[in-house]
From Swiss-Prot:
Gene Ontology biological-process entries: mRNA transport; protein import into nucleus
Protein name: Importin subunit beta-1
Pfam families: HEAT_EZ, IBN_N
Mutant lacking the gene: phenotype: Essential for growth. Spores germinate, but fail to divide.
Highest taxon of source: Eukaryota
Function: Importin beta subunit that functions in nuclear protein import through association with the importin alpha subunit, which binds to the clasical nuclear localization signal (cNLS) in cargo substrates. Docking of the importin/substrate complex to the nuclear pore complex (NPC) is mediated by importin beta through binding to nucleoporin FxFG repeats and the complex is subsequently translocated through the pore by an energy requiring, Ran-dependent mechanism. At the nucleoplasmic side of the NPC, GTP-Ran binds to importin beta and the three components separate, leading to release of the cargo.
Amino acid sequence: MNAGEFLAQTLSPDANVRLNAEKQLENAARTDFAQYMVLLAQELANDNSMPYIRMAAGLALKNAITAREEARKLEYQQLWQSLPVEIKQQVKSLALQTLGSSEHQAGQSAAQLVAAIAAYELATNQWPDLMVTLVANVGEGQPSALKQHSLQTIGYICESVSPEVLSAQSNAILTAVVAGARKEEPDAAVRLAALGALYDSLEFVRENFNNEYERNYIMQVVCEATQSPEASIQTAAFGCLVKIMHLYYDTMPFYMEKALFALTTQGMYNTNEQVALQAVEFWSTVCEEEIEVNLEIQEAQDLNEVPARQNHGFARAAAADILPVLLKLLCNQDEDADEDDWNISMAAATCLQLFAQVVGDLIVNPVLAFVEQNIQNPDWHQREAAVMAFGSVLEGPNVAMLTPLVNQALPVLINMMVDPVIFVKDTTAWALGQISSFVADAINPEIHLSPMVSALLQGLTDNPRIVANCCWAFMNLVCHFAPVDNHQTSVMTPFYEAIIGSLLHVTDQKGNENNSRTSGYETLGTLITFSSDSVLPMIANVLSIILTRLETSIQMQSQILDVEDRANHDELQSNLCNVLTSIIRRFGPDIRTSSDQIMNLLLQTMQTAPKQSVVHEDVLLAIGAMMNSLEEQFEVYVPSFVPFLSSALSNEQEYQLCSVAVGLVGDLARALNAKILPYCDDFMTRLVQDLQSSVLDRNVKPAILSCFSDIALAIGAAFQTYLEAVMVLLQQASSVQAPPGANFSMIDYVDALRLGIVEAYVGITQAVRTDNRLDLIQPYVHSMFTLLNMITADPECSESLTRAALGLLGDLAESFPKGELKSYFAADWVAALLNSGKTKISSQQTKDLARWATEQVKRQARA
């Protein structure tokens, strides 16, 4: 096989040539994977090959051993591991050799390949000398290309390999990357690569960072890099400071005082926007960290504990100097930029919002002075900045302080909705949304509501970006002024007809520019959810229009030509289904008059939509709403619906769809009760398969356990058929624990898993008790108490899990009132569990449940 020739052809503009070359390479990989890998590695290392061919070889090699999808990634890993040791060694040796290439594309491709292999082999100690080699490559006197590409490799490895695996190498890695980042390094490309590697390594060098001497040296090198004449190095250095502030806020007071305040303020004024963006991001990160610290302090105080962390007040101390800079940067709008392009004025606005949340009332006066000075300015940049500044400080300061200011500003802002400049109108619509979100009590319905609604209605006929913000403002208004318990009317009722009419026009567009159509549908759904009884005839009319649109969209499936059309069509159908869901929930049982037509169209939508379409989830959610509204009357649709539900349950690849399907099985059980029994064998088989699947996302599994509870409650003692298998699964799941030092994701998963187990136990216990078959669960009582003991001993246990555990404890006590389980209830941890539900910070629901469970347990003692 001539690898170079085929690789060149994969880049051909001729589709036939390109496809043939790709096919030849695929065949070569299937026929002799070892030879295929060696040939590609040789091509990557070949200095006589064209750069683009070498890059293609590196990419093909990387794609042969790694993938985004976990299942395929595992398959490729096994394929790589199956290669003879000498073949793997040859590929790795050629990749390391290529790191020294003066051709950057080849060196970078080699760096990515080495990191991809390292992701497998470092964890199993199959490449023990890799990091030693890379660190040596960065040493004094080595060629610049070798340094640069080795540093990039270190960065890629730090991104993809677990910190636990690399922690033993942290000293060597840090020495290498910091040495490369020093101002004494003459090659800017090497210095930039070193800063990139430092950025990627910061998470696992905590031990080094806690050492004051090492920390001082790292901070010195990074701070010096912010003063480089190269903008790219400055940007990378400020990026490192952003991450350092995020990871090591608690160690920053000395550096803030000595250097960081001055450096970042100077950086915000930099004429290179990328540098300025990172400097602003630094202060956004300061604010985010102080918001987080404040939450932790409040939580500790609620528990009568000493806070573990201190708010150093960086934002408050710097506000007087930083706020004027941010306000000035607000005026640097780029009218030619796309809305999705992140620029300095957007970054400044975001930073201003975060400052408002941290410093509160302190921000109001300086911002108000800026607003008053610029709100009427002939220069639209100043006007828009004034509106942006006002809208940015509405979350954080005391509402009582803001209310008179909002009262004064509203008439001005409403008038600015007809400003001749689109950017001003867009920001004004956003500011009205901010007011209706955070200071809605300042809106006087008798004075402000009518002109505000009129201005927003006018905005719905404007540019799509303005439409989206007007929709958001309407959603906030409708939520705030919602009728209490769907009473006959609300202050928003007189405007419903006009708003709904405008939204139906907005949503009747072929395109979805600036997300305007989707925003329109979301707003329509919100209006329906919070509608008063008096507008239900209007909602019925909306239902008719939505069903017509859904039917038309089904007929259009055959006319879709390309990926863009498919995405647009899927989004439209999802929006229609979401509005239908709102209508079904709002009408409740009264939806029965239209349910035949709705169900027919929803099932057609599922049948005609592509297998991978996101529409399936939204259809299922709409059908779930129908189940909850109709309850037992939904039975007529079950035979035609169950095949779709079963298919979704078995779709392990699309875990979100599977998760929705699991929830619907529970809904169906609650709706049908014992009438679900004929379908239980199929459902239980699929649910158990999902639990045992290695492909399905683990976060779906707690919901499956909860679903067992719903099925048990629906069919009572008939659950005996599945009891033994389910109890074995629950016992296995109970053994899952978060290891010491586990991340929050794992801790949350274990908590959710235990919640699902407890809910399953509760449902099964209540089901067999109702049918007087408590004998069925007696063999499993010991497992239940073992789990409850584990939950009680877990310091990370959430309140929802504590509440569920109290419920199970009380149910067991109530179910065996004659003292059959007396010895279990006498354990010391039982009292600890009961007391954990009565703490100061427990919700009233948890306290009530704890009191009830305590009464049940006391009866055990008296039995």
